[in-house]
């Protein structure tokens, strides 16, 4: 229901702006993401590592400027999000006791998913100077999952489309600043857990019950460059003209 309401609002906003001949433009960019996580398993605060990712992060935005100082944007994004746990074997998700051969062994587990996002944000600032603050919400579909395990110097991994191990749809809120030149600094917080507490099964042949995860919340800080399509086109045309002239 919420998704249908969002689509309706965006459709109405689009046609209202078209009718009023306001400024509408497209922009594109990527992201460099540094993320962290808050993980608790069976009452234990699990040690987590910071996660640095560059690939694959793509953002396409439709910008609606009501005035020179107030507007909004929506669009689509694809990004790589997840968490890294590094702790004793019994603390990273496995349903084992002290008789297990791996008990008390240092183990690293990486959970990640590619996410398709649908953002909606308000922006306030000086659009003529390309300098503004923004804040909003995003709904992300976790469509491709990967898990890696590192133990005793060995690495194991598997992937799955639409895995039940992560929540399918995760909402988030974010705030950020765009600076002249298109540089962006953003903070995002995911409002739901990353892992699905209803999942019961096996990971790498070991029994797991994700209901034992009391929390698997993630957040991130990102740097990006967002450029208007007309700016990108101008750069391409200028580079092409320079190459032709050089020949």
Which residue ranges define each predicted feature?
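Predominantly the C-terminal beta-signal and adjacent terminal strand-loop region
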Residues: 161-247
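Short glycine/proline- and aromatic-enriched beta-strand/turn motifs that initiate or cap beta-hairpins
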Residues: 20-62, 224-230, 234-236, 243-247
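Bacterial Sec-dependent N-terminal signal peptides
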Residues: 1-31, 123, 131, 223, ...
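Outer-envelope beta-barrel architecture signal
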Residues: 20-28, 68-72, 129-133, 171-173, ...
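Residues on the lipid-exposed face of transmembrane beta-strands in outer-membrane beta-barrel proteins
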Residues: 30-32, 56-66, 76-78, 116-124, ...
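Membrane-proximal, glycine/serine-rich, low-complexity loop/turn segments characteristic
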Residues: 20, 63, 70, 74, ...
């Amino acid at each position: 229901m919420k998704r249908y309401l969002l689509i309706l609002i965006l459709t109405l906003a689009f046609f209202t702006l078209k009718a009023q001949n306001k400024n509408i433009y497209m922009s594109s960019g990527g992201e460099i993401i540094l993320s962290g996580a808050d993980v608790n398993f069976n009452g234990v605060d699990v040690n987590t590592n910071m996660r640095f990712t560059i690939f694959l992060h793509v953002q396409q935005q439709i910008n609606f400027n009501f005035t020179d100082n107030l507007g909004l944007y929506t669009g689509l994004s694809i990004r790589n999000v997840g968490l890294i746990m590094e702790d004793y074997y019994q603390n990273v998700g496995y349903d084992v006791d002290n008789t297990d051969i791996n008990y008390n062994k240092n183990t690293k587990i990486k959970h990640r998913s590619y996410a398709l996002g649908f953002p909606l944000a308000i922006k306030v600032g000086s659009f003529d100077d390309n300098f503004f603050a923004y804040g909003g919400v995003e709904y992300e579909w976790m469509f491709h999952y990967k898990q890696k395990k590192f133990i005793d110097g060995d690495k194991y991994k598997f992937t799955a489309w639409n895995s039940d191990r992560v929540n399918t749809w995760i909402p988030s809120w974010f705030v950020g600043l765009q600076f002249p030149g298109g540089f962006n600094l953003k903070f995002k917080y995911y409002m739901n857990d990353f892992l699905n507490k209803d999942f019961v099964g096996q990971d790498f042949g070991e029994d797991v019950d994700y209901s034992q995860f009391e929390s698997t919340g993630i957040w991130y800080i990102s740097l990006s460059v967002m450029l208007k399509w007309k700016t990108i086109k101008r750069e391409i045309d200028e580079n092409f003209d320079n190459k032709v002239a050089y020949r």
